[in-house]
Amino acid sequence: LISGITANKYDVVMTGTSMTVSRAKAVGYTLPWGRTGYMPLTQKKNAGRFKTWEDLNDPNVTVAYNLGTSFEEFVKRELPKAKVKRVESPARDWQELVAGRVDVTISSILEASVLAQKHKNLVPLFGDDVRNSVPLGFLVAQDDQVWLNFMNNWVMMKTSLGYFKSVNEKWG
């Protein structure tokens, strides 16, 4: 996503992009429009195996993440004892989970909700203990202040109309 913005392949990334300092060095962010956090996702048959985040930090647990994502940084920092499977794009970490090649993947609240609806054998864990709460913003080019101003005004208008509140209520 970042490389597409910096290469001028597109003007805006409107996914649930978490704000990080490292990303902000390369791209611009709009004003925040919501928050997200990280939660583990596993197969339903394994849900009883994991009661807390600490249960994931175990050499007998394989955790998948996509290279170059904020999830990679999180897993390295918070789950250093876990066995990891690094997944390179265009493949996705959750595909490894669906296929049963890993025990867990770390996902955003939104993506975990969508994946659990789409793949009935997956279940999010620890919904009451979401980690790494961060603001969400849309990505734009750093050097286009006019476009950033437009996008910020759009975010403010949509926020005042309750649009993002309804999106967050629907998707978590």
Where would I find each of the regions flagged by the language model?
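Short helix-initiation/N-cap motifs at beta->coil->alpha
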Residues: L1-S3, K51, K85-A99, V134
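Hydrophobic residues within well-ordered alpha-helices
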Residues: I5-T6, L56, E96-V98, F138, ...
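Ligand-binding clefts/hinges and TM-proximal coupling segments of bilobed small-molecule sensing domains
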Residues: S70-K85, P124, V155-G172
